[in-house]
Each structure stands twice: as structure tokens, then as C-alpha cells.
Amino acid sequence: MLIGFSQVYAQTVSGTVQSATDKSGLPGASVVMKRAASDAILTTSTDVQGAFRFERVPSGNYTLEVRYLGYDLLSRPVQVAQAPVVLGVLSMQEQNTRLGEVQIIGRAPLGEQKGDTSQFNAKAFKTAPDASAEDLVTKMPGVQVQDGRIQAQGEEVRQIMIDGKRYTGEDVTSAMRNISSDMIENVQVFDAQSDQAAFSGFEDGNRLKTINFITRKDRRQGYTGKISAGYGTDERYMAGAAINYFNNDRRITVTGLTNNINMFDFSIGETPGGGMRGRRGGWGGGSPTGIINTNNFGVNYQDKWGKKMDVSANYNYTNRDIVNDQYRFRDFVSDEAGLQYTEDSNNRDREDGHRLNMRLQYNINQNNRLLVTPNLRVQNDESFTGRNARTFDLNGTLSESLNRASSDNTTFNFNNNILYSKRFGDSGRILTTNFNTSINNVDGDGFQYEQTQNFENADNNVLRDQFIRLDRKNFSWSGSTNYSQRLGEKSRWQLEYSIGNQMRDSDRRTYDYVETAGEYADFNMPLSSSFKSDYLSQSVGPSYQYRNDKTRLQVNARYEYAVLDTDSQFPVDLDPLKRKFSNFLPSAEYEFKFSQSQNLTLNLRTNTNVPSVEQLQEVLDISNPLQARIGNADLEQDYQTRFNARYRNFNAETNRVFFIGMFGTMTNNYVANSVYTTSAPEGLAEGYEFRPGARLSRPENMDGYYNVRSFFNYGQPLNFISSNFNVNGSVGYSRIPGKIDGQVNYSNNTNLGAGFNISSNISEKIDFTVSTFSSYNIVSNTLRTTQNNNFFNQNTSLRYNWILWKDLVYRTELNHQYNSGLSAGVDNSFLLWNMSLGKKIFKDKQGEISLSVNDLMNQNVSIRRNITESYVEDVQSTVLQRFFMLTFSYNIRSFKGAPAPDENMQRGPGMHRGGRPGMN
């Protein structure tokens, strides 16, 4: 009775938070409602205009508290009765401490922890005047670049927001490179809910690590961007531009790039040739592999159509030509001592693709919302690989293979998701429905030529010349319905039903070259396959959620029933195979807030995965004849359990930050590789003759896969050198099951890593970052226990920007990599040194002419170690080496009501004068 009475009188509470000084809205402010008679608490944050809204607030007396960096706490009582509460404008007073006529000036606060959101004050991290958002965030605690990708708190950043609105598109790094750092007031790092979870209010396990950039109020109307062009030695060239237009809700970004210096996208914070930020790093830093010519054009659009429609879209065209030579060394896990494999290959790839992503959200009314997110990708790939490979043991060479392979494939991918949510007034009931469709087709052809010499028996030498035709069609759809109901002030329950269907049809036909006919006319049945699969899954189950001011708990229990139908017509016409699966899929999430600055989150999820058509299709792939592969139509779905634990502590008074996290995965029925080295079971690979030292791999379900890793970061200011200091470390362990000639092998890899980072906070004229990270890997196998593949890797880097006398700008970047324990023939260490000297020109200093050098020492290399259940390999690839380039760049900065660019360079080192942090 009491619960029902409370629900009847649940109301909305809304208002707008503004600065008392200039009446501007304060975005990202923390708004909390505490109930006077209990420990119940409600939290939210303001949008880009400073507005906030609480839904379904039970009647009673509350205390409303608003917090914002650089402002005094605002607190006021609020009474909720039988009508919506409109608080109107809430004005916050700036913090401004004076002693007589002497103003107290201190270091800008680093930020604060707001629940599970880490918020950083951008002005507490000094960057160069023309820096990008990427340059800014990589100075912040827990944020780093790993293998060319941005990571935050140990996880890859998967989504970018600007003032709380999602940046539509697939490339997170590109988005950050096109936002100037001087536009940003605060940076928020958090795990964003999926659209489904945000609409329903229940977690679905699909959170994405997200960075939200809250822009300065004087940077929301105007233009920003950069135009650059350069030419250098060895006919190296680059021309690119990025232009951003901002008019409050409307935001348009246009980018273009053409170059042959391995830049994949344009960055407004980079001087091409003298920096690496426009490129994608390889293992341990360094350049991307190969010599890459890229032509790229993109448009990003975001707007609000009327009062109810939010629209965003992203279009990208990319044309890329890649030339890459590689050396590969493999040390096999085998009963044959010293069995190894080497390969020299030259690779040529041409890519031509279009991508279109859209997001349309229609807020029909207060209780109904509709979200449509279509995505389209069309791509053509042409590739050529020439490979010279050999296998050998302690007695010498066993076989040598020369083969060439070329292909021309066109991929069409379309995905559309429709999400609808309905709230039944203030009753607390919510209905959410979701429907998704996906089409993924691949159409292409290719040629393969092989000449293999058998050193044990010349009669078994192989000469092969073939044409291959591929036609693959995949169509899938899925839908779900969720109904949730409030049980009281602190708890809710939900019932969910979902259904999905994946239909895949793969047809691969191989023809041998007939010398007398002069064409590819002889159909090769063993190397051809026609295969279909149909996977239908359904699940149903309840969820329960409880929350108060300190605790959030959610538990889910789903029952899943699935059917997998497969049908193979050739190489062997098999009867259709039907397999049925039933699983119990529990999940749970727990969060405890020790205080506003400390919280702990625990998460457990389970799910199943169906094998891919490539894994199911029993067709022999001998594109690399010494490393052949074949599918397995008897594969079953795997069962995966994932868990993670995170603890965050952000002390705003001392500016000390601490994160620690643990992430783990355990998989039953893991799709492992079963490797055959001498002969395969009868009928498995008809028509294939084993070359000496060759291997045939086939997927097989096995238990015993584990992957556990942990990460920590501690950061604090070093005031005596006006810098920020971060120390981080990691511990990881993985166990990968597999089979070698029927014997079970577990590949165990333990990884230990530690490093530190010091980034300057002196002024915009001096900007440096020094970092180092070392890792040691212990690799062991249960079959070959004497094999030692342990290795050590250390990467140390320095980035330094200095605005000298008379507007001269010096930039340098050093990256040193040291490796120990790699195979012979692979470079153990290198020093990559990029440098530029530029001169600011024009009255407003927005132009620059610079002379830069890439890889001054001409030592750059790319090295990668891969660890599997059947071998350990080292790969060294072609990289771009030394060249010089003369570049002209022009920075575009024009904002309504903003100070001139040179005025922005006059702020002191990490200081602010009252008011909002870092603002004059």
C-alpha cells in the first residue's frame, strides 16, 4: 500500500545551473538530491546548457546539492508533493579568495571523482597552443597510447562525446585529433551505458569506455581547424586539412588528407614529418608497418532538428596503397626438437572504401523515445603476396616453398538498429523494444601459385596453379523486448525476452590451370566447398536492481536455447546437421561508493558465441602450403565468463589519483587449434599431401582457456618542477589450450609490466612528456617444457615542444625500444628520432613554416612477437625511415566573443584567477 501510494505521487524535478557572474550555463555539474528522512539519493549531471532533470522522484523532503569545479557548493531544500517541481535558474558563486588587495593565486585543481566518472580540469594540464585533444588527454592520469590506440584506466577508449553528445563514427583517435585542446574545459572518463541500458535503466553488460569533452562556453560558436601542406626528400608529400564549425547544437567537421608518409588521418595538433601523432603505432610504439599512401575525406555532422530530433552522421572515404615486406620466424611446439619455420614475404594491398554512420533520436514526448542507427560500409580490397618459406630442423632444410597469391574482393556491410522506449507516466513502468538487421556480403576471386621443393623425396615436389571464386552472404536479425517495474524507492525488476537469427551461405570454388586448354578449367573438388549455416537463439529471464546513496546492485538470470543447422554440399555431400544448445546465463554488477571520490565496481557476465562460417566450413585453405588450414563442421558454441573489478580514488584536495582494475575471461568449449604435423585423420583433408615440416590446423572445442590481467595507475602533481607524475603497472596471465598430433598442449604466458610518465605543466611555451614502460613475458608450454621463449621489452619516449625566441618553435620526439630474447635475425633495439624547427608567421601567429625530419638516425624498425598454443613467432616488417620535409601550416581559430589567440598564451603556469578554473 505504501509503495503504491509513493509511486502515484512520484514527480519530476528540473532546473538550470548557471554562473552568477555571466549567466552562462554550467555543463557537467554534479546534481544530487538527498532525502531527509532516509539514506535515499538521486544523482545526475547537467547538459551542455546547464539543464538537469530527475524523473520519478517520490514525494518527500530533499536537500539538493550542486557541485562544479571552481564554484562554491550550492545547497537548497526541495519539497516534492503532487506536482512537478520546476526550480528555475540556480546561480552558483565563483570561488574567489582575497586578502585585502592581494589576490591568492593557486594551482588549478586537477579534477574530481563523481561516482564512476573521473573528471579532469583541462587547464591543469598545459599543452602547446596548437595542441589537439589527444595531446591533452595523454597527459592525464590513467590515459596512454598503446599500439596506436587510446587507453584509459586499462581499457581501450571506444567512444567520444562532446558536451554529452556522441561523436558518430568508428574512429575514436581521429575524432580526438580534430578537436583543439584550447576548446576544452573539462574531460570526463567513464563507462557509458549502451543505448538499450540507457533507455531501460538496466545494465546489459555492453558498457563502453568513453571520454566526454566539455567545451568552454566561449568556444561553442565559431571555427577551428588547421591546413597543412609539405614536400620532402624521396618524393615524400603531404597535404591535409581539418575544419570544425560550431554553432551551439550544430557542429560540422570536414577533413581531407593525401600523403605517402604513413599518416592515416589528419591531426590539428601535429606538424607532419616531425611528429607521430597522425600515425598508428606498432608494437611498443613506432610507425605502422609498410609504406602507405593514403587519400582520405570525411564529414561529421551533428545537429538538433527542432525541439525533438537529435541527428548525427559521419561519412568517410579512404583510398590506401600499402607496400610491406616482412620477415617471419616461428619456433614450433613439437616433439621434433628444433622444428622451425622462416618466411620472407612481400605484400601489396590496395583498399578503397566508403563508410556512412548515422544516429537519429526522436524524443516523441516526455514518455516516448525512438532511436535509429543505420551504418553502411562498402569496400574493395586488392592484395598480392609473394612468399618464400622454408621449414627446417636440427638436421637441415625439410622443404622450401615459393608461392604467390592475389585476390580482388568487394565487401558490402549494412547494419540498422531500431530502439523504442515507452515510460508509462510516473508509474515507474518502462517498456523497451529493439530490432536489428545486418547484411554482410563478400564477393571476389583470386589466384594462387605454388612451387614446393621436398628435400626428403623429390618425387613429392608440388607445382600448383589455381583460380578461386568466393561468394559469401551473411544475413542476421535480432529483436528484444524488456519490461521493467519499480518495486519501491530503491529497487526495480525487469523481464527480458530476446531472439536472434544468423543465416550464412559460403560458396568457394577452385579451378586448376589446364596447360593444354590455356585456362583454369579443371574443377578441384577437395579445395572447394558449398556450406550453409542457420543459427537461431532465444533467451528469457528476469533482472533485479537495488540502489541507494552508496550501493548499486543488479543481478540477472537468463535461460538461452539455441539451434545450429549446418548443410554442406561439397567437397562431401553430408546430411544436414542439427545441434541444440541450452545454457543458463547469470550476470551481476555491484558498485559501492565509499565517498564522492572513492568507488568500487564489480562485474560478472556470461555469454555464448557461435563459430564463424570460416571455422565451420570444411574446405582446405593452402594459400600458405606449409601452414594449411581446414574448418570443422562439428564445432559447438563456446561459453564465456567475464569478470572485472575496478577501484577509483580521486582526492581533489591533494590532486592525487589512483585507479586499479582486474579483468578476466574464462571460456569453456573454446575454439582452439588442433595441429597435425605428419599426417591427418583419414578423410580429413582429402587431396592434401603433407610437405616435410608443414602443419595442418583444424579448429576444435576445448576447455581450459583463461586470460586474466590487472592494471594500476597512481598520479599526482610534482609542484617543484610544475609537472604531473604518473606511475603504472600491470600483471597478466593467459592459458591457451590446443592440440599437437592429438596431444593436449597449454601455452602459458605471464606478463609483468611497470612504467612511469612525467608531463610538464609549466606553460604553453614549454611542453614535454617523458615516459617509459618495461615488460617481461614468461612463456611456457606443457608439451615442450625445455623450450625458452621468455622475452623482455622496454619502450622509452620523450616528446618536447619549445616556443623559442622570436616565435621559433622546436619540436622533438624520441622513441627508444629495447628487446631481449627475440629470435636471431630480428633487430633487438632501435632509436626513432623525429624533429622539426618552425617559425610562427603572420600577425596573429597562426601560420607556421617548419623543416622537419622523420627518423633522424635511420634506425626505425617494426617488431612484433606473437604467442599461440602451437608456436611462438617474431615478425619484422618494413617501416618508413628517414626523410626531410618542408611544411606550411595555418591554424584556424575564430570564435564569437573569444580573446585573440596570442592572449590565450599569456596565462601563467597552471594558475587561475578565481572564477572558473583557467579562465580570465
Report each predicted region and the residues it spans:
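Membrane-proximal, glycine/serine-rich, low-complexity loop/turn segments characteristic
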Residues: 51, 65, 72, 79, ...
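Short, acidic Ser/Thr/Gly-rich low-complexity loop/linker segments typical of extracellular
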Residues: 36-51
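A short, solvent-exposed loop/turn motif at the edges and junctions
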Residues: 34-39, 61-77
